[in-house]
Structure formats: structure tokens, C-alpha cells
A protein has these predicted regions:
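Glycoside hydrolase catalytic-domain context in secreted enzymes
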Residues: 16-731, 741-752, 763, 768
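Surface-exposed, short loops/turns at beta-strand junctions within beta-sandwich domains
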Residues: 737-738
Length: 768
């Protein structure tokens, strides 16, 4: 470790110094840089070390856990010179005013004792989710299901506005991880499994959060922290914070792509993957942190660790012998701020490492510059706190946006015999553990880390309450109930199944609301992707009645239901639609609104067949000729991009501007979409490409564009896409981007057209 990981950073610097410097990802601002240098030259070593450390607010709490202890604040800021604080008091959301008052107290003391403003950070994930009076939107996985970037923009704008209103200038959002393993407990925090979808949605959210000028972030915007850089979402075991093994070409082509898009959009900070890639902990990976981002992108932003992950380098990963060695490893690899929640002596250790020469003064100053630059760009030196009136806080407009986003995100997966929509006079029986739970509708990062919406937001409707408000005859019996202890999300009480089945006998239709209770991060790890045995037993019991069952899936990841899906007449996946999700579902089931969501992930059918839509062509093979029974057929419950509507759409006239192209060309693609049904409807039009022959085994297809349109019955609209030829390139075995001569198939809505690349091009730059 000592002979390899630490010298790697120096090696990268040497290479970078000899290579042409790329244009900066964020253009430098002379006034910003002058301010940074003027502050830096006056700082002591201890002050510099303190700027690199971020502590949890719990270290400042008094015995009530609801207020700051002035003596503790004096020590943390006066003795340790700490530059950043994060999180919420008592591990629970507070009001905007309570949060603002707390941060004002910290800032006043920071300016008094250090002369440098503190920067406060919070995990705001799907809105102002750590404010009791804030606006919540559907989780990222739902926004991905809309295939409508406007909702990522709306959520980002509202989140920034309300967070800044609480004096918080930095959010740990958006989540950039690709949700490509359905076992992973954080899949719901992503926009889905596809890199292009993730990149488009995350870029919209980033720009909405930060605004258009990253050097001057206004008082209605906040700094983002792209997380978790990178490859975090595909742990080999499916368990959170465990190792990933990713080929380098896939790492750059798929996992880096969304980050690249957002770095180029001006993202000011990024949080690092808590685990490891190919045996190297990401927090010690100089190639990725310093090489791929700081050097190859000429990015002057800040890398912050995730929770206590410097400690994990020695406690868990065993690549360092102790805390000091771990600090040196991380900082020399490119970490600029250490989220060390409970240990202020981290500051002292950094001072010692600099004095011992194990962290160079140049690396220290570089990290401090990045921290100061962030604070200058946020205007914190001019206004550590601010008195702006936020008159649009929690405006009804934000609630309407959230409702609309939920409507467009909930996915109709099955509608046998057109059982949906339901007439309001139908006798409806509602059951299942998710029927009457706001906690389940919201998921994690909702008022509390593990989710606790019922405690904080009783004014919103659960699924049951929304159905009772919309339909005339609704009865309810849960059948299965969750243990509401925060860390016991998998525990269920199934003693009420027989009672629920008996109560359903008089109904015309049964709505069974199943799925998961809320969880977040490692506590969400599990050993079986199947929907729980108790919930399946409930559905099987209900099926004996011969009544039509509408299965509502309220879950953060696609739990396997292949054995009970045939028992259901309709299936709706609402995922985690948040506070307005119950009302959205009622509007959809009644026909007041139309379904238009599509799955942003592949819904697997079998436990040993967890595929993504862009699998390799060699993974799907029919039986080979002869005696060798080669069975490798893709069989999923529902594919990526699947979703039904109450109307129907026909695609025609798929055309491309040229049947032959070169590397510098832009292909113009058009397709006609017609609403052939009797209802107004929205349709997400998805464009794919397939490379038919390549020097590496190609993916069967890749998403290259999408657009959401609304059509009246009988209306036809021509959807246009511009597809740069470079978008069809892939990363070869040598790590270089390449577009190879040969045939490609472009497809959309079941139609296909062939085009030919007439030349091969290999790029020498790492990013195109």
C-alpha cells in the first residue's frame, strides 16, 4: 500500500504536468481566485487543516439534542477550526426557521473565531426532505420513470429555493449512481439503470440546483454534490458498501458518463463512493479522483468523503494501518474534505501529517483552495447568513408539480381485460401493508434517514385515504402490517391474512398494496429479492375468492413477483412517489388522469437472471444446433422502458437524414407517433441504437434519446432527434473511445432503420 497507492498521486501529477492542460470544466473567475488567495495566505496551518474537516451536528448538541451547546461550539470552531458541519439535530427534520436559527448561530461564531464562514451541508434527496415544512417530490427513481426532464428541473429548483431559505447552501444531491443491480438497497435513489437517462435527468437537476453561473451561486440556489463517485451502484454482492468489479471500458463508458455530463455543467462538488472498485477503495483511488476528474477535466471543485469513509480505509478495507495513514492516503489521492462525523482530532492529525511531510504543503493548499473557492462561489464570505424573504417557500405550485410528477411516474404494467380505470361506484377492498403508510410512499431520506413520513406529515393522503376520497365504497383490512421500528423494515405481522381474505368477499375488486417499508443505505441490505412470503401469501389467499386483483407495488427496488403476477388482473408500480403519490394513484385508477410512466429499470423475473436492458448480444442465445443444449434466453418480467396507457400509440415513418455517416456527422432522426385510442395521453418516445459488429462484444441496444409528448385522440406528432455520430462510439479494450466502420440499427417504437458508418475513428482524448 505504501509503495503503490500514495506514489500514484505523484505519478499522475507528473503525467498531467507533461500533458496539455484541458479547458477548465468550470471557467475561472479572477475575482473569485483573488479572494481565495487573499484568505489562504493569512491562514495558519491549523486553520487550513480545520477547513478540510466536516463534523456531524450531534457534536454541537446540548443535552436536549434540540439546541447548540455554546461551550461545544467554542471548542469545535475555536480549538479545531472546523470548516463544515452537516446533518440535522436529533437525527430528525426540523422546520425552516429552526434550521436557519441553528446555522446562524454557527456562522456567527465561525466568523468571530476563524474569520472564515462555515459551510453547512444536508442530504436533501427528493426535495427539502430534512425540513418539516419543506416540499417533497417523488424519489429520483420515479422521476426517471417520467422520462420527462422537466420534473428533475422542477424538483431541483424547489429544493434549492427551500434549502437556501433555511440557510443551508450545500446539498448532497443529485444521486448519480446507476441502478443496475436490483438487489442494491439504494437503487431508488437513482434515476434508473441507463447512463443516458441518468445523465440527462441529473444535468437538469444540477443546473436547477446551482443556477447557470457556478462562480456566483445566488441566494435561491445551492451547491450540488454529485454522489457517489463512482461505480457505487453495482456491488458484487448486491449489498451496500461492498466491493464492485467493473471493467475499465464500462467504467468510463457507462458509470462515468453521467458524472462527466454534470461536471461539464458546472457541478461544484462530488461525494466519493464508500466502497471499492477492482480492489482499490475509491477514497484512495488517485487514478479516478485526481486523474480522471481533477486532471483530465481540469476541474477545480471539491471532493468530499462519504460518512466516516477515511476510517473505513483502515477499519474495514485494511489498506491503511491507522487513522493517520488513512488520512494521508485519502488526501494524497485527491480527497479535499473529510466527512469525519464524530472525531474533531482529525484536524490535529492532518497538522501532524503535514509537519511530517506525509501530506505536502502543495496538496494541503490545493485542498484548502478548493474549500475556500466553494465558499466564495456561494457568497458566504460576503453573506455568511442572509435575510432574504422566501415568499414562495412551500408554495402550492411546488405541491402541484410534485403531484404531476407522481402521476407521470407511476407505471401501469398490466391491465387485463381493461379492468382499469375503475368506476367510482365499484365496491373496492383495499389491503396490504403499504395501503395506509406515508412512510412507505416516501421511502428513505424523508424527515429521517430511514424515513418517517407518518410521524411528520399526517396531512397528506396514504393510498387508502386517497382512494376513500375518490371512490364511494372503499373498505380496508391490512392483512399484513410492518414493524415500524426504523431498522426493522423487513419485519412483518401476517396474523391478519385470514381476516383480510374474509373481508374481501363482498368486494367487486381488490386493490392489494404490497412492496417494502422504507429503508436507506446498509440497513436496506437483504438476502432474498423475492417479495416477502407473507405478502405473497396474502395475494394467494385473495386470489382464491375469484375477484379481480389490482396489485399495487410500492417499493424502492423491483421485488420478484413472477409467481403471483398471473393471479392479478392489473399491476401498477408506484415505486416511491412521496407525499402526493396516494392522490396521484387515485387519479390514475379512477381515470381522472392517464398513465404515462415507463420503467427506468429492467423488472427481473428470476433470482438468477438479474439483467439490464443493454446486456451483451452474446447473453441471449437460442439452443445451439446439435446435442449441446445452450440455453441463454433473456426472460424478464417487464423490460426497461415498458409502460401501458389507457390509450394506444402507433409509430410510423421512422426516417434518418442519411444512410451513411462519418465520425463528425450528426444524424437527424424523425418518427411519427399517433394516438390511436380514445383518450388524451402522454407517450415517452425512446430512441435506441444497436452496433451490429464491433471489436468488443456490443450491447444489444443503447438508449440514445427520449422525448415526452402529449397527443389528443387521433393526433399525430413528428418527434425529431439529433444524434451525433460520436454518441455511437464505445470505449475499446485499450481504454480509448472508438467509432468503428460498419452497420448500426436505429430503433424506436418497434420500428428500425439501418445506417452505415463509413470510417473508423479512435479518439486520443479520454472524454468525447
Amino acid at each position: 500500500m505504501k509503495r503503490y497507492l500514495i506514489p500514484l498521486a505523484a505519478m499522475l501529477c507528473t503525467v498531467a504536468c507533461n500533458a496539455p492542460k484541458p479547458s477548465p470544466a468550470i471557467p475561472a473567475d479572477k475575482a473569485v481566485e483573488a479572494k481565495v488567495e487573499s484568505v489562504l495566505k493569512k491562514m495558519s496551518l491549523e486553520e487550513k487543516a480545520g477547513q478540510l474537516v466536516q463534523l456531524n451536528i450531534s457534536l454541537l448538541e446540548d443535552e436536549t439534542h434540540e439546541a447548540i451547546d455554546p461551550a461545544k461550539l467554542e471548542v469545535i470552531l475555536g480549538q479545531y477550526k472546523v470548516g463544515s458541519i452537516l446533518n440535522v439535530m436529533h437525527d430528525a427534520a426540523h422546520s425552516r426557521e429552526e434550521t436557519a436559527a441553528m446555522i446562524r448561530q454557527i456562522q456567527e461564531k465561525s466568523m468571530e473565531l476563524i474569520g472564515i464562514p462555515c459551510i453547512y451541508g444536508m442530504d436533501m434527496i427528493h426535495g427539502a426532505t430534512y425540513l418539516t415544512d419543506g416540499s417533497f417530490y417523488p424519489q429520483e427513481i420515479n422521476l426517471g420513470a417520467t422520462f420527462n426532464p422537466v420534473y428533475a428541473r422542477m424538483m431541483g429548483k424547489a429544493m434549492a429555493y427551500e434549502t437556501r431559505a433555511a440557510q443551508v447552501p450545500w446539498v448532497f444531491s443529485p444521486v448519480m449512481d446507476l441502478g443496475r443491480d436490483p438487489r442494491w438497497p439504494r437503487l431508488w435513489e437513482s434515476f434508473g439503470e441507463d447512463p443516458y437517462l441518468q445523465a440527462v435527468m441529473a444535468r437538469e437537476e444540477t443546473l436547477a440546483l446551482q443556477g447557470s453561473d457556478p462562480n456566483h451561486v445566488g441566494l435561491e440556489n445551492v451547491a450540488v454534490s454529485l454522489k457517489h463517485f463512482m461505480g457505487y451502484g453495482v456491488p458484487h454482492t448486491g449489498k451496500d458498501r461492498t466491493p464492485a468489479y467493473i471493467a475499465e471500458n464500462d467504467l468510463r463508458e457507462k458509470y462515468f458518463a453521467p458524472f462527466l455530463e454534470c461536471f461539464r455543467a458546472g457541478a461544484l462538488t462530488a461525494m466519493v463512493n464508500s466502497a471499492s472498485i477492482n480492489g482499490v477503495p475509491t477514497h484512495a483511488n488517485a487514478i479516478l479522483l485526481t486523474g480522471w476528474v481533477k486532471e483530465q477535466l481540469n476541474w477545480d471543485g471539491l471532493f468530499v468523503t462519504d460518512w466516516a469513509d477515511i476510517d473505513n480505509l483502515y477499519v474495514r478495507d485494511h489498506v491503511a494501518a491507522d487513522k493517520k495513514e488513512a488520512l494521508a492516503l485519502g488526501i494524497n489521492a485527491g480527497i479535499d474534505m473529510i466527512m469525519d462525523p464524530y472525531d474533531p482530532t482529525c484536524c490535529t492529525a492532518i497538522v501532524e501529517l503535514v509537519k511530517e511531510g506525509k501530506i505536502s504543503k502543495a496538496r494541503l493548499n490545493d485542498a484548502v483552495r478548493r474549500v475556500l473557492r466553494l465558499k466564495v462561489r456561494l457568497g458566504l464570505f460576503d453573506k455568511p447568513t442572509w435575510d432574504k424573504e422566501y415568499t414562495e417557500f412551500a408554495t402550492p405550485a411546488f405541491a402541484h408539480e410534485s403531484f404531476d410528477a407522481a402521476v407521470e411516474s407511476e407505471v401501469l404494467l398490466k391491465n387485463e381485460g381493461g379492468i382499469l380505470p375503475l368506476a367510482e361506484h365499484k365496491k373496492i377492498f383495499v389491503t396490504g401493508p403499504n395501503a395506509n403508510s406515508l412512510r412507505a410512499l416516501n421511502g428513505g431520506w424523508s424527515y429521517r434517514w430511514q424515513g418517517s413520513a407518518d410521524e411528520f406529515a399526517p396531512q397528506y393522503n396514504t393510498i387508502l385515504e386517497a382512494l376513500q376520497s375518490r371512490f364511494l365504497h372503499v373498505t380496508y383490512e391490512p392483512g399484513v402490517v410492518y414493524d415500524e421500528t426504523p431498522m426493522a423494515w423487513q419485519n412483518e405481522d401476517a396474523s391478519g391474512i385470514a381476516k383480510a381474505v374474509a373481508a374481501a368477499r363482498g368486494a367487486d375488486v381488490i386493490i392489494a398494496c404490497v412492496g417494502e417499508n422504507s429503508y436507506c443505505e446498509t440497513p436496506g441490505n437483504m438476502d432474498d429479492l423475492n417479495l416477502s412470503a407473507h405478502q405473497k401469501a396474502l395475494v394467494r389467499g385473495l386470489a382464491t375468492l375469484g375477484k379481480p386483483i389490482v396489485l399495487v407495488l410500492n417499493e424502492g427496488r423491483p421485488r420478484l413477483i413472477g409467481d403471483i403476477e398471473p393471479l392479478c388482473a392489473a399491476v401498477v408500480d408506484v415505486m416511491l412517489p412521496s407525499n402526493h403519490g396516494g392522490n396521484a394513484l387515485a387519479a390514475l385508477l379512477s381515470g381522472d388522469r392517464n398513465f404515462s410512466g415507463k420503467l427506468p429499470f429492467t423488472y427481473s423475473k428470476h433470482i438468477n437472471a438479474l439483467h439490464t436492458y443493454d446486456y451483451k448480444v452474446s447473453e441471449h442465445r437460442e439452443t445451439m444446433e446439435g446435442s449441446y443444449n445452450y440455453d441463454a434466453v433473456m426472460d424478464v418480467q417487464w423490460p426497461f422502458g415498458y409502460g401501458l396507457s389507457y390509450t394506444s400509440f402507433a409509430y410510423s415513418n421512422l426516417k434518418v437524414s442519411a444512410d451513411s455517416f462519418k465520425a463528425g456527422d450528426v444524424l437527424k432522426v424523425a418518427v411519427d407517433v399517433t394516438n390511436t385510442g380514445k383518450r388524451t395521453g402522454k407517450e415517452a418516445v425512446l430512441l435506441y441504437s444497436s452496433d451490429l459488429v464491433a471489436s468488443l462484444i456490443p450491447d444489444v441496444k443503447r438508449l440514445r434519446g427520449f422525448e415526452k409528448i402529449e397527443l389528443q385522440p387521433g393526433e399525430t406528432h413528428t418527434v425529431h432527434f439529433e444524434l451525433p455520430a460520436s454518441a455511437l462510439a464505445f470505449v475499446g479494450a485499450d481504454g480509448k473511445w472508438r467509432l468503428e466502420a460498419g452497420d448500426f440499427r436505429l430503433s424506436c417504437g418497434g420500428l428500425g432503420v439501418m445506417v452505415k458508418c463509413s470510417e473508423t475513428k479512435v479518439w486520443d482524448t479520454p472524454n468525447i
